[in-house]
A protein has these predicted regions:
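Generic structural hydrophobic/aromatic packing signal, biased to beta-strands
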Residues: 7-9, 38, 61
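Short, charge-rich amphipathic interface segments used for partner binding and complex assembly
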Residues: 47-78
């Protein structure tokens, strides 16, 4: 019998993703935190009235963090 350790990322009682590595689970959780903050920021803009689109855009930006940092000049190409 094998023992398998799984790390579950959960938000508001809902299972979002399961990982076998704690580092991967932590990275995903951090990305979700960033998406939550971006969602709040996008909501303040009133450019996107559809919350679903705000959520999709926030998730896209969080998933593409490195490219976003380059685009806004917070990080330089080496």
């Amino acid at each position: 019998m094998a023992v398998i350790v799984k790390y579950v990322v959960e938000r508001n009682g809902e299972e979002k993703m399961t990982f076998t590595s704690k580092a991967e689970a932590d990275a995903y959780d951090k990305m979700l935190d960033m998406a939550d903050e971006l969602f709040t920021l996008l909501g303040k803009s009133e450019l996107l009235e559809d919350e679903g689109k705000q959520e999709d855009l926030a998730m896209f930006l969080a998933q593409n963090k490195e490219e976003l940092l380059y685009a806004i000049g917070a990080k330089r190409n080496v």
